[in-house]
Amino acid sequence: AVQQLYGRDSPYVWRRFGLSDESIISAQELRFSYGSPDDGKIVLDEVLKGININIRSGEFVAVLGHNGSGKSTFAKHTNAILTPSSGKIYVIGIDTKDENRIFDIRQNVGMVFQNPDNQIVAAIVEEDVAFALENIGIPSDEMRKRVDEALKTVNMYEYREHSPHKLSGGQKQRITIAGIIAMRPKCIVLDEPTAMLDPAGRRDVIETIKMLNRQYGITVVLITHYMDEAAKTDRVIVMDSGTVILDDIPSQVFSNVELLKKIGLNVPQVTELVYELNKCGLNLDSHIITEEECVNALKTILKEE
């Protein structure tokens, strides 16, 4: 309520609720173009068009957009898989074009992709979680501790001696997340991590992500096309054609139903219901995004009648 009253960027809000104003990711006039051959020439296709995004420590941010909006390209800039064609992106204060600091960036910002099979490299779950730790020379005692803690955190400790390839899609994705958090990152960027999962797998992964943010203070950037996932975050950024068109708390963003539909996006089911009821003559708050809020609003109207 206070966030809505004072606005997402109010210093009051961040100090009052113990949220840091430390910037984890800062994109400044970020532009990026892919080059493709055409009749012997390289043709540039600008995918990011001078975007400005600042993500603070401890935030849980969803980035939405239709295919081709630039959201996944932005995600790949957050740990220097891609670097800007122009403009800057700073991660934990480091310019991602500084080749001498790539290791520091990737230690602090872990990435999880759509298909967990592409990130699983070992035949045993605990060995997979330990893989990156071995590569950076973590001592064996510390490695054992981190692997166990990471698996317990994502509720996969009992599967530590299993083959990852025999697990469900949701379980595999949680193993991938365990491998990331064993590195003790400040931020996790997830690029459509539930796109290939069934509803149960999606729910498990999203609950794990929420827990990492709420209990451990890990900054989370969730690239998704599921509106109901985005509605559970602190902040929603909407991209279209390489630009940022909306950036606010979920209830404020999703109240722009017609704009979102115009760029090919849906809204959460509850928001859609409220929108349709209002078209039929009811006067419900357009910022409603949860079932509880909707039920309470309808009860109030029924009592008045």
Where are the model-predicted features located?
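Conserved ABC transporter NBD signature motif
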Residues: 87-97, 105
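Catalytic Walker B motif of ABC-type/P-loop ATPase nucleotide-binding domains
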Residues: 188-191
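Helix-to-loop junction immediately C-terminal to a conserved catalytic motif
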Residues: 79
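Conserved ABC ATPase "signature" region
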Residues: 141-159
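The feature captures the beta-strand-to-loop junction immediately N-terminal to the Walker
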Residues: 64-66
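Conserved ABC ATPase signature
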Residues: 163-167, 171
